Amino acid sequence: MLSKLFRSRAPVAAPTLPAVPEGTVVWAVGDVHGRLDLLEPLIDAIMADLRDAAATRRVVVFLGDYIDRGPDSRGVIRRLAGLSQVQDIEWHFLKGNHEQAMLGFLQNPSTGPKWCEYGGDNALRSYGLRVPELAHRAEAWARVAADLRHILTEAEMDFLETLELSVSVGDYFFSHAGARPGVALNRQSPEDLMWIRQPFLDSAVGFERVVVHGHTPARTVQADSRRIGIDTKAYETGVLTGLRIQGRERSLLQSSGPQRGPGTRYGGEEYLPVDGEQGVVVRAARIDPQDPGVAVGG
């Protein structure tokens, strides 16, 4: 009788590590924020890796926030808009809150002062436009918006207007900001996908997939069993991060260049060399799959 009441437990299987399908290589790139100087070498390194990869499906996901804060928003948009011409790669360009703000400004110029509070002024300067000196002058902002619409090429506007909100590959879900806990990933609101922060970051509730995101900056990659954050504050730190996923293996690739000096504006002439190095350095590391919060140099 006792043996029937107290049956021995079956051994508990180790948790299955997240993966992408066999034959697939996925790259995700964090928030660029106008740092074309960091984006170019990272794209070159990713393209070289994909050329050599033994894969039948090659995916690259940019997580949004391409503009603002850094010195060359225009150059970044132009570069990304041209990538779709590269064949044999599945490109996904996600919409960040900064792209939403720029599009909102084009539709409603009265939002200009608010947009410029978090870096929109640098985006406008990259297009050769001056921010109105009197923030409350509606007609001045309307002229700037009209000038920006005139300057943007058809390819650039098409790029901005067709940005995606999310994409899933295997056990991974990619969005700009994260996702709202307790809501299925396929039912997330656009607002949360572009803007959510603390409700996502502070929750211990998991999702159907591991969420790969940007939006919330940190000087190091943030990784645990439910999310991987790869916004390394490129506009200030001079470090732009790429995440590579193949099978169950995850690794990091970072381009490192000049960083913004304390107390300076975002203009390119005010960037300082990082660690005394000139130019841009590409560094690699891997994320330990048994301890996803640890990035291991390699």
Where are these regions (language model features)?
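N-terminal active-site segment of His-dependent metallophosphoesterases
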Residues: 1-79
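Acidic, His/Gly-enriched loop-helix segments that form or flank divalent-metal centers
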Residues: 124-125, 129, 133-229, 233-239, ...
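Extended recognition/assembly regions associated with phosphoester-bond processing machinery
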Residues: 3-22, 41, 54, 161-165, ...
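Active-site neighborhood of phospho(di)ester-bond hydrolases with catalytic His/Asp-centered motifs
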Residues: 29-30, 61-64, 92-96, 210-216, ...
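Short, glycine/acidic-enriched loop or turn micro-motifs at the edges of active sites
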Residues: 33-34, 68, 100, 179, ...
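Active-site neighborhood of divalent metal-dependent phosphoester bond hydrolases
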Residues: 56, 69-162, 196, 200-202
